[in-house]
C-alpha cells in the first residue's frame, strides 16, 4: 500500500464528491421543470360560451369534488365494493361511472396537477411530493387550471378541506380551508374526521360555489395493510355514507354537481407510484339528479380494474369546464367525456367539441407550428361538419401524441453531467487498476473477475426488462461470485468444515431468494413472506421471537459488550454473578423485549389477528398502560388513538435505549481500553433497530442473513495474510449480498414498492427529515445490515465465529485501519462510477422510450439513493465513525 495515505484519501473523496455532483447535474437536466404556456385561457368566441344553454346558463352553477385518495376503480364498481349507495345511483342513472387512467408517477402531487391543469405529469413532482410543508415550489399560481378559471370567471368562491397538497398548489385560491398532512400514514381516522366535521356547517350555508374534500384515510390503510386490510371495508362504507350526505344536499340544490374520484389507485400491497394496472386505474363518477344514464353496478371483479367507460383522468378538466361553463385551461390535454356530452342538445355538441379541439390545437401550434398532417386535419374539421366520432378520434390522437412528447429535457445539464461522470469513471478506473495491478500483490484473476462483473452488471441498464427484473441479475451474480471464490479463495473443497459452511451460505441465499416476490413483471403468492403473513401467522411470530432470541444471544456472547460492562477485569465472559454482566444482559433483554412488544402492538393496531398464544402478552402490554379492552373494539376511535400513543412510546423507548447502549459501549470501552469487539457490538445492536424498522413478515429473513454471515466468516477466517485479496473478496461479496437482500425483502426499482408502513415508528407528527430517515432505514435495512457486517468481516471475523479476538484479525493492525477502509471504498467506488456512466448513457439513448418515466426514471432515483445514502452515508461516513471508536 504505497503512496501518501492522506493524499490518496483526498483524491478518492474528491472523486466520490465529483461523481455525485455529476449525477445531480444530470438529474437536473433530465428532470427539468415543465415548460407550460403562460397566461389564462378564454373562450374562442369571446361573445358567447359554447357550453351554456340557450339562455346563457351553465349546466351547473356549483360543484362538490370529493377526492378519496388511492380509490382504485374496483373499490367503487366491483362486486367486492362496499359503496352500496353509489351502486344505487349508477343503477338509477344518477351517476356516470368511469375508470380513469392516471398517468405515472401515481403519487398525489403530480396527479393533482394533472386533474386541475389537464397537463401530463412531470416526474420531478414525484420527488417534490414529499417536500416539506414550507416548500411552495410546486405552486400553480401562475399556471392555468380549472380552480383558477372557476374562481375568476364569475367571481366565485371555493372552500377546501383535506390533503394540504392542495394548499401548496393553490395558495390564496380558497376562501375557507383546513389542510391535513398526507404523510402520517398511521392515522386512518382523525385525518378523515377533520374533513367530515366541516360538512354540517358547509352544507347548511350558501357561502361557497365550489367545495373540495380530499380524504386520506383509505390511502393510509392501503400503505399499512394493503387493499385487503380489515379496515378497508369500514372505510369504504364511511366514504359511501358521506357521499349519501352530499347527494341528499344536491337533491335540494340540483344545480350542484358532485364529482367522486380517486387521485390514483394502489397495487396489491397497498402502495402506489408505479404504472401497474391497479395503480393507474382510479375511480371517477359524475353525480347529479339531472343525469339519466342508467348503468349496471356492481360489476364482476376483474384483475385489469377496467369497469364501465375508460377515460384519461385529465379528461376531467375539459369536462368540468363544459359542465360549469368556464374556458378550458390553457395547457390541458384532456378530452370532454363522451357520455357527459349527452346532457346537451345534439345541435350544440359539435360546437362544444370544436372548442375542445381549438384549445388543444393552440398547444399543438405552440409546439409544432401551424403545419403538417395534423394541422390539415384540423382545418378540415373546421371547414365542414363531421360525425361526432371523427372529432373524438382527432382529439384522442392529439392527446396521445402531445402527452408522449411533453418532456423538455435540459440538454446542457444532461451532457455536462454525463461528461463529469465519464471523466470521473475513467479516473477511478485508472486509480483502481494502478493500485491492484501494480502496487498490490494480488491474484490478477480476482481483479479481472471483479472488473468483468461490474461491466456486465452495468450493461443491464440498457434494457427496460432487465431493470424491472434486476433481482434475477443479482441472484445470478451472487451465485457466480461465490462459485468463483469457492475455487480461488475459500478453499471450499479442502476441508469438510469449509464445504459445509459453503453449503449453508448457499442454502441461506436460496432461502432469501424465495422469501418475497421481487421484480415488476410477475406477481405470485407462492413465496415465504406471503405464506407467513396470510396462512401461518403462528409460524411467523414463532420465527420473529426466534430472530430476536438469536440476536440477543449474539449481542451477549459474540462481541465484547459483557466484558466492557463487567466489574471484573480480564475475562471475556465474566462470572454470571458479576453485576456488570447482569446489567448488560438486562439492558439488552429490555431493548429486544420492548422492540418485540412494539412490533406485536403494531401488528394488532394494523387490524391483524394476534395468535392466541400471544393474546395474554398483548393484553399485558395494553393493560400496563392503563387501557381497558374489555368494553371496546378496535373500531373505537378513542381506543385506537390510545393504542397508537402506546405504540409511539414503545418505539421511542426502543430507539433511546439502543442509542444509549451504543454510546455507553463506546465510551466505557474507550475508558477501559477494550479495543476488540466494538464493530461487532455496534453491528449487533444496530441490527435490533433494523429489525424494529422491518415489516413483520420480513423479520425472520434476518435469521438467514445472520447464518449467511456466520458461514461467510468461517470461509474467510484466518485468510488475512493476503490483505488486498481479502479486502476485495469481502467487499465484492458484501456488494452482491447488499443488492440481493434489497430485492429479496420485496423491494424493486419502482416507486410503488417503497414501504411507508414503518416510516412513522415513534413519530407523533409529520417531520420530513425524520420520516425520510426512517423510510430509508426501513427500505434499505438489508443493505445497511451488510454494510455493517462488511466491517465485521474485514476487521473482526474471529468474533463472528464466537472464537474471541485473534491476532490474525485486521483490527489489531491499527496502522492499516485507514488503508483498509480506503481500499474497500475504492472497490465500491469503481462499481458505482462505472454503473453511473452506463445508467446515464442508457437514459440519454432511450430518452424517448415508451418506458422512460415508468422504468428508467425511477431507477435513476433508486440509484441516487444507493450512491448517496448507501455508498457515502453508510459505507463511508458511518464506517469512518465506527472505526474511530
UniProtKB/Swiss-Prot annotation:
<comment type="similarity">
    <text>Belongs to the PIGG/PIGN/PIGO family. PIGG subfamily.</text>
</comment>
<feature type="transmembrane region" description="Helical">
    <location>
        <begin position="413"/>
        <end position="433"/>
    </location>
</feature>
<keyword id="KW-0256">Endoplasmic reticulum</keyword>
<dbReference type="GO" id="GO:0006505">
    <property type="term" value="P:GPI anchor metabolic process"/>
</dbReference>
<dbReference type="Pfam" id="PF19316">
    <property type="entry name" value="PIGO_PIGG"/>
</dbReference>
<feature type="glycosylation site" description="N-linked (GlcNAc...) asparagine">
    <location>
        <position position="155"/>
    </location>
</feature>
<feature type="transmembrane region" description="Helical">
    <location>
        <begin position="865"/>
        <end position="885"/>
    </location>
</feature>
<keyword id="KW-0808">Transferase</keyword>
<feature type="transmembrane region" description="Helical">
    <location>
        <begin position="495"/>
        <end position="514"/>
    </location>
</feature>
<feature type="glycosylation site" description="N-linked (GlcNAc...) asparagine">
    <location>
        <position position="82"/>
    </location>
</feature>
<feature type="transmembrane region" description="Helical">
    <location>
        <begin position="539"/>
        <end position="559"/>
    </location>
</feature>
<dbReference type="GO" id="GO:0005789">
    <property type="term" value="C:endoplasmic reticulum membrane"/>
</dbReference>
<feature type="transmembrane region" description="Helical">
    <location>
        <begin position="820"/>
        <end position="840"/>
    </location>
</feature>
<feature type="transmembrane region" description="Helical">
    <location>
        <begin position="726"/>
        <end position="746"/>
    </location>
</feature>
<feature type="transmembrane region" description="Helical">
    <location>
        <begin position="768"/>
        <end position="788"/>
    </location>
</feature>
<keyword id="KW-0337">GPI-anchor biosynthesis</keyword>
<dbReference type="InterPro" id="IPR002591">
    <property type="entry name" value="Phosphodiest/P_Trfase"/>
</dbReference>
<dbReference type="InterPro" id="IPR045687">
    <property type="entry name" value="PIGG/GPI7_C"/>
</dbReference>
<feature type="transmembrane region" description="Helical">
    <location>
        <begin position="447"/>
        <end position="467"/>
    </location>
</feature>
<dbReference type="GO" id="GO:0005886">
    <property type="term" value="C:plasma membrane"/>
</dbReference>
<comment type="pathway">
    <text>Glycolipid biosynthesis; glycosylphosphatidylinositol-anchor biosynthesis.</text>
</comment>
<dbReference type="Pfam" id="PF01663">
    <property type="entry name" value="Phosphodiest"/>
</dbReference>
<keyword id="KW-1133">Transmembrane helix</keyword>
<keyword id="KW-0812">Transmembrane</keyword>
<feature type="transmembrane region" description="Helical">
    <location>
        <begin position="473"/>
        <end position="493"/>
    </location>
</feature>
<dbReference type="GO" id="GO:0030447">
    <property type="term" value="P:filamentous growth"/>
</dbReference>
<feature type="glycosylation site" description="N-linked (GlcNAc...) asparagine">
    <location>
        <position position="194"/>
    </location>
</feature>
<protein>
    <recommendedName>
        <fullName>GPI ethanolamine phosphate transferase 2</fullName>
        <ecNumber>2.-.-.-</ecNumber>
    </recommendedName>
</protein>
<dbReference type="GO" id="GO:0006506">
    <property type="term" value="P:GPI anchor biosynthetic process"/>
</dbReference>
<comment type="function">
    <text>Ethanolamine phosphate transferase involved in glycosylphosphatidylinositol-anchor biosynthesis. Transfers ethanolamine phosphate to the GPI second mannose.</text>
</comment>
<dbReference type="GO" id="GO:0051267">
    <property type="term" value="F:CP2 mannose-ethanolamine phosphotransferase activity"/>
</dbReference>
<dbReference type="GO" id="GO:0036170">
    <property type="term" value="P:filamentous growth of a population of unicellular organisms in response to starvation"/>
</dbReference>
<feature type="transmembrane region" description="Helical">
    <location>
        <begin position="648"/>
        <end position="668"/>
    </location>
</feature>
<keyword id="KW-0325">Glycoprotein</keyword>
<feature type="transmembrane region" description="Helical">
    <location>
        <begin position="581"/>
        <end position="601"/>
    </location>
</feature>
<dbReference type="InterPro" id="IPR017850">
    <property type="entry name" value="Alkaline_phosphatase_core_sf"/>
</dbReference>
<dbReference type="InterPro" id="IPR039527">
    <property type="entry name" value="PIGG/GPI7"/>
</dbReference>
<feature type="glycosylation site" description="N-linked (GlcNAc...) asparagine">
    <location>
        <position position="443"/>
    </location>
</feature>
<keyword id="KW-0472">Membrane</keyword>
<dbReference type="GO" id="GO:0009267">
    <property type="term" value="P:cellular response to starvation"/>
</dbReference>
<dbReference type="GO" id="GO:0036180">
    <property type="term" value="P:filamentous growth of a population of unicellular organisms in response to biotic stimulus"/>
</dbReference>
<feature type="transmembrane region" description="Helical">
    <location>
        <begin position="697"/>
        <end position="717"/>
    </location>
</feature>
Amino acid at each position: 500500500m504505497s503512496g501518501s495515505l492522506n493524499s490518496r484519501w483526498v483524491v478518492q473523496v474528491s472523486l466520490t464528491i465529483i461523481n455525485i455532483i455529476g449525477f445531480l447535474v444530470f438529474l437536473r437536466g433530465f428532470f427539468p421543470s415543465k415548460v407550460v404556456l403562460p397566461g389564462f385561457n378564454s373562450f374562442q368566441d369571446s361573445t358567447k360560451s359554447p357550453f351554456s344553454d340557450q339562455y346563457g346558463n351553465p349546466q351547473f352553477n356549483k360543484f362538490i369534488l370529493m377526492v378519496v385518495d388511492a380509490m382504485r376503480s374496483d373499490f367503487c364498481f366491483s362486486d367486492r365494493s362496499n359503496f352500496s349507495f353509489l351502486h344505487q345511483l349508477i343503477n338509477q342513472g344518477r351517476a356516470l361511472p368511469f375508470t380513469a387512467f392516471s398517468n405515472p408517477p401515481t403519487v398525489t402531487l403530480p396527479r393533482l396537477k394533472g386533474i386541475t391543469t389537464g397537463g401530463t405529469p412531470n416526474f420531478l413532482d414525484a420527488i417534490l411530493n414529499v417536500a416539506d410543508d414550507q416548500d411552495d415550489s410546486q405552486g400553480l399560481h401562475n399556471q392555468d387550471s380549472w380552480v383558477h378559471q372557476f374562481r375568476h370567471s364569475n367571481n366565485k368562491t371555493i372552500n377546501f378541506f383535506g390533503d394540504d397538497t392542495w394548499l401548496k398548489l393553490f395558495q390564496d385560491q380558497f376562501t375557507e380551508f383546513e389542510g391535513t398532512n398526507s404523510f402520517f400514514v398511521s392515522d386512518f381516522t382523525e385525518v378523515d374526521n377533520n374533513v367530515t366535521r366541516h360538512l354540517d356547517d358547509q352544507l347548511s350555508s350558501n357561502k361557497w360555489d365550489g367545495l373540495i374534500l380530499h380524504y386520506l384515510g383509505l390511502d393510509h390503510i392501503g400503505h399499512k395493510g394493503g387493499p385487503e386490510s380489515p379496515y378497508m371495508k369500514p372505510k369504504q362504507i364511511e366514504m359511501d355514507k358521506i357521499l349519501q350526505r352530499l347527494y341528499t344536499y344536491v337533491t335540494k340544490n340540483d344545480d350542484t354537481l358532485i364529482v367522486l374520484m380517486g387521485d390514483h389507485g394502489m397495487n396489491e400491497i397497498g402502495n402506489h407510484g408505479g404504472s401497474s394496472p391497479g395503480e393507474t386505474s382510479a375511480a371517477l363518477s359524475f353525480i347529479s339528479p339531472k343525469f339519466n344514464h342508467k348503468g349496471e353496478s356492481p360489476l364482476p371483479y376483474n384483475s385489469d380494474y377496467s369497469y364501465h367507460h375508460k377515460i384519461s383522468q385529465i379528461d376531467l378538466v375539459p369536462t368540468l369546464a363544459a359542465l360549469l361553463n368556464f374556458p378550458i385551461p390553457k395547457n390541458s390535454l384532456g378530452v370532454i367525456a363522451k357520455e357527459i356530452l349527452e346532457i346537451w342538445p345534439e345541435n350544440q355538441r359539435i360546437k362544444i367539441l370544436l372548442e375542445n379541439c381549438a384549445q388543444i390545437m393552440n398547444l399543438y401550434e405552440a409546439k409544432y407550428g401551424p403545419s403538417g398532417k395534423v394541422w390539415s386535419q384540423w382545418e378540415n374539421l373546421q371547414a365542414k361538419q363531421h360525425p361526432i366520432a371523427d372529432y373524438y378520434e382527432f382529439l384522442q390522437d392529439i392527446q396521445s401524441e402531445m402527452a408522449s412528447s411533453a418532456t423538455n429535457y435540459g440538454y446542457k445539464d444532461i451532457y455536462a453531467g454525463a461528461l463529469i461522470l465519464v471523466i470521473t469513471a475513467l479516473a477511478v478506473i485508472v486509480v483502481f487498476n494502478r493500485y491492484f495491478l501494480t502496487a498490490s500483490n494480488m491474484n490478477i484473476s480476482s481483479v479481472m473477475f471483479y472488473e468483468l462483473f461490474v461491466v456486465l452488471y452495468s450493461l443491464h441498464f440498457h434494457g427496460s426488462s432487465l431493470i424491472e427484473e434486476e433481482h434475477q441479475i443479482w441472484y445470478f451474480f451472487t451465485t457466480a461470485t461465490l462459485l468463483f471464490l469457492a475455487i480461488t479463495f475459500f478453499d471450499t473443497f479442502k476441508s469438510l468444515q469449509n464445504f459445509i459452511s459453503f453449503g449453508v451460505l448457499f442454502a441461506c441465499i436460496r432461502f432469501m431468494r424465495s422469501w418475497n416476490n421481487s421484480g415488476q413483471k410477475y406477481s405470485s403468492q407462492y413465496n415465504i413472506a406471503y405464506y407467513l403473513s396470510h396462512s401461518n401467522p403462528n409460524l411467523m411470530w414463532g420465527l420473529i421471537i426466534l430472530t430476536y432470541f438469536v440476536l440477543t444471544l449474539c449481542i451477549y456472547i459474540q462481541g465484547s459488550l459483557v466484558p466492557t460492562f463487567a466489574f471484573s477485569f480480564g475475562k471475556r465472559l465474566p462470572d454470571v454473578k458479576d453485576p456488570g454482566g447482569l446489567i448488560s444482559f438486562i439492558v439488552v433483554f429490555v431493548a429486544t423485549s420492548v422492540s418485540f412488544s412494539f412490533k406485536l402492538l403494531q401488528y394488532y393496531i394494523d387490524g391483524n389477528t394476534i395468535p392466541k398464544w400471544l393474546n395474554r402478552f398483548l393484553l399485558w402490554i395494553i393493560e400496563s398502560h392503563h387501557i381497558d379492552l374489555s368494553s371496546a373494539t378496535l373500531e373505537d376511535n378513542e381506543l385506537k388513538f390510545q393504542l397508537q400513543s402506546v405504540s409511539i412510546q414503545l418505539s421511542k423507548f426502543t430507539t433511546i435505549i439502543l442509542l444509549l447502549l451504543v454510546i455507553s459501549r463506546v465510551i466505557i470501552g474507550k475508558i477501559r481500553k477494550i479495543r476488540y469487539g466494538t464493530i461487532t457490538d455496534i453491528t449487533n445492536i444496530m441490527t435490533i433497530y433494523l429489525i424494529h424498522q422491518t415489516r413483520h413478515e420480513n423479520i425472520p429473513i434476518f435469521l438467514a442473513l445472520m447464518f449467511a454471515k456466520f458461514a461467510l466468516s468461517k470461509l474467510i477466517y484466518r485468510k488475512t495474510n493476503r490483505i488486498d485479496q481479502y479486502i476485495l473478496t469481502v467487499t465484492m461479496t458484501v456488494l452482491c449480498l447488499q443488492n440481493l437482500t434489497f430485492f429479496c425483502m420485496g423491494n424493486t426499482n419502482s416507486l410503488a414498492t417503497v414501504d411507508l408502513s414503518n416510516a412513522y415508528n415513534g413519530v407523533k407528527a409529520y417531520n420530513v427529515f425524520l420520516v425520510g430517515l426512517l423510510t430509508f432505514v426501513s427500505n434499505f435495512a438489508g443493505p445497511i445490515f451488510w454494510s455493517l457486517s462488511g466491517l465485521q468481516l474485514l476487521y473482526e471475523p474471529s468474533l463472528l465465529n464466537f472464537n474471541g479476538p485473534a491476532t490474525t484479525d485486521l483490527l489489531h493492525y491499527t496502522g492499516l485501519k485507514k488503508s483498509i477502509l480506503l481500499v474497500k471504498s475504492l472497490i465500491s467506488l469503481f462499481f458505482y462510477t462505472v454503473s453511473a456512466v452506463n445508467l446515464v448513457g442508457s437514459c440519454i439513448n432511450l430518452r424517448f422510450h415508451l418506458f422512460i418515466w415508468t422504468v428508467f426514471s425511477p431507477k435513476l432515483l433508486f440509484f441516487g439513493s444507493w450512491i448517496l445514502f448507501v455508498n457515502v452515508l453508510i459505507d463511508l461516513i458511518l464506517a469512518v465513525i465506527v472505526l474511530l471508536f
